[in-house]
UniProtKB/Swiss-Prot annotation:
<comment type="similarity">
    <text>Belongs to the SHMT family.</text>
</comment>
<feature type="binding site">
    <location>
        <begin position="125"/>
        <end position="127"/>
    </location>
    <ligand>
        <name>(6S)-5,6,7,8-tetrahydrofolate</name>
    </ligand>
</feature>
<keyword id="KW-0808">Transferase</keyword>
<feature type="binding site">
    <location>
        <position position="121"/>
    </location>
    <ligand>
        <name>(6S)-5,6,7,8-tetrahydrofolate</name>
    </ligand>
</feature>
<dbReference type="InterPro" id="IPR015422">
    <property type="entry name" value="PyrdxlP-dep_Trfase_small"/>
</dbReference>
<dbReference type="InterPro" id="IPR001085">
    <property type="entry name" value="Ser_HO-MeTrfase"/>
</dbReference>
<keyword id="KW-0554">One-carbon metabolism</keyword>
<keyword id="KW-0663">Pyridoxal phosphate</keyword>
<comment type="pathway">
    <text>Amino-acid biosynthesis; glycine biosynthesis; glycine from L-serine: step 1/1.</text>
</comment>
<dbReference type="GO" id="GO:0046653">
    <property type="term" value="P:tetrahydrofolate metabolic process"/>
</dbReference>
<feature type="site" description="Plays an important role in substrate specificity">
    <location>
        <position position="228"/>
    </location>
</feature>
<dbReference type="InterPro" id="IPR039429">
    <property type="entry name" value="SHMT-like_dom"/>
</dbReference>
<dbReference type="GO" id="GO:0030170">
    <property type="term" value="F:pyridoxal phosphate binding"/>
</dbReference>
<dbReference type="InterPro" id="IPR015424">
    <property type="entry name" value="PyrdxlP-dep_Trfase"/>
</dbReference>
<feature type="modified residue" description="N6-(pyridoxal phosphate)lysine">
    <location>
        <position position="229"/>
    </location>
</feature>
<dbReference type="InterPro" id="IPR049943">
    <property type="entry name" value="Ser_HO-MeTrfase-like"/>
</dbReference>
<dbReference type="GO" id="GO:0005737">
    <property type="term" value="C:cytoplasm"/>
</dbReference>
Length: 417
């Protein structure tokens, strides 16, 4: 029998110390990794519930195990809520991650060796969109499109590649692109060659839910997303569709289970349900609007300080700082900013001469700091501090001064109070 009197810090002090240190880091450092955010305490409460104990292979009402009547309620709540959030008529909330959701779509709709057309990782796409190091680039014949000299998707070039290679699937979505995507144009390109249009909206799902970024739901055959990032839920994935026929729905359902997954993570699905309820609240739209305002304030400030932003600015939650030609690499900049308690990630930029392990870019995002309560002026200040560090990454005095300023700012906006 378990004892409620035993605490983690006494039973496993090594692990407890690591968890406490990470909690402290999240409070004391500014989080600018575009794919990270903070879950609400309610989301974490659901994820830490007894639902973690339950096996529930199958779907609500059609399980392979007994005792699923209550986890069925949790999963159905998640399904119904996410359909309402995005205006979908099909939703699968079981994928363990965005990458698994993408894998499910490929395996449901394609055969090994089929041609896919996706955005190059080096130009802002994602590993799972056909990168050679990923299964999507090994199982399928992956053709890649990129951005032009202005850092924008060249839709005429995408059309040319589609016409030339006749892909069975066109993939739209990104991990490092700061402008709005013309989903209708992508659908027209896909239709012109008889291809599926698959949209991975993982990075902008929260913005889409709030109506501050165009929705792909009326254009794509199938849509996937993560449930963290801008959606601000637990780490996980979802698959959505609108107007999908019965055959497509059956393929998607059966490929998730039993195709590539067994038992779903019911505690995570419960946490997803909480996050989806939060996404339906009026405050969520206000939050997403502020995410974009904050990103634009940061981008404009960095531009004013002489730093190049790929595509010239941002219309979403992120920006890509291009440092080609500068002495500092993305790797060195990430390390220097880390010493100043500013957490970012190095990132390749279009036509990057440095390796992906070094890079000439930084990806910055505002979802996490906006959750803390940051406003535009806070982001102007923060962007100036970032520029100060990038101007003098080896100057310990500058790093110390910025670290002190960041510490004071973090105390002003605690994550969990």
């Amino acid at each position: 029998m378990f004892s409620r009197d035993v605490r983690l810090e006494t039973y496993d002090p090594e692990l407890a110390k690591a968890i406490a240190a990470e909690a402290g880091r999240q409070e004391d450092h500014v989080e600018l990794i575009a794919s990270e955010n903070y879950c609400s305490p309610l989301v974490m409460e659901a994820q830490g519930s007894q639902l973690t104990n339950k096996y529930a292979e199958g779907y609500p009402g059609k399980r392979y195990y007994g005792g699923c009547e209550f986890v069925d309620i949790a999963e159905q709540l998640a399904i119904d809520r996410i359909k309402q959030v995005f205006g979908a008529d099909y939703a699968n909330v079981q994928p363990h991650s965005g990458s698994q959701a993408n894998q499910a779509v490929y395996l449901a709709l394609l055969q090994p060796g089929d041609t896919i057309l996706g955005m190059s990782l080096a130009h802002g796409g994602h590993l799972t969109h056909g990168a050679k190091v990923n299964a999507s680039g090994k199982l399928f014949n992956a053709v890649q499109y990129g951005v032009n000299e202005q850092g924008l998707i060249d839709y005429d070039e995408v059309q040319r590649l589609a016409t030339e290679h006749k892909p069975k699937m066109v993939i739209a979505g990104f991990s490092a692109y700061s402008q709005k995507i013309d989903w209708a144009r992508f659908r027209a390109i896909a239709d012109s060659v008889g291809a599926y249009l698959f949209v991975d909206m993982a990075h902008v799902a929260g913005l889409v839910a709030a109506g501050v970024y165009p929705s792909p739901m009326d254009h794509a055959h199938v849509v996937t997303s993560t449930t963290h990032k801008t959606l601000r839920g637990p780490r996980g994935g979802i698959i959505l569709a609108k107007g999908a026929g019965e055959d497509l729905v059956k393929k998607l359902q059966s490929i998730v289970f039993p195709g590539i997954q067994g038992g779903p993570l019911m505690h995570v699905i419960a946490a997803k349900a909480v996050a989806f309820k939060e996404a339906l609240e009026p405050e969520f739209k206000t939050y997403q609007q502020q995410v974009v305002k904050n990103a634009q304030a940061m981008a404009n400030t960095l531009i004013a300080r002489g730093y190049k932003i790929v595509s010239g600015g941002t219309e979403n939650h992120l920006m890509l700082v291009d440092m080609i030609g500068r002495d500092v690499s993305g790797k060195d900049a990430e390390a220097a900013l880390g010493k100043a308690h500013i957490t970012v990630n190095k990132n390749s930029v279009p036509n990057d001469p440095r390796s992906p392990f070094v890079t000439s870019g930084l990806r910055l995002g505002t979802p996490a700091i906006t959750t803390r309560g940051y406003q535009e002026q806070d982001c102007v200040d923060l962007a100036n501090w970032i520029a100060d560090v990038l101007d003098a990454p080896a100057d310990d005095a500058v790093l110390a001064k910025v670290r002190d300023a960041v510490t004071a700012q973090c105390k002003k906006y605690p994550v969990y109070g």
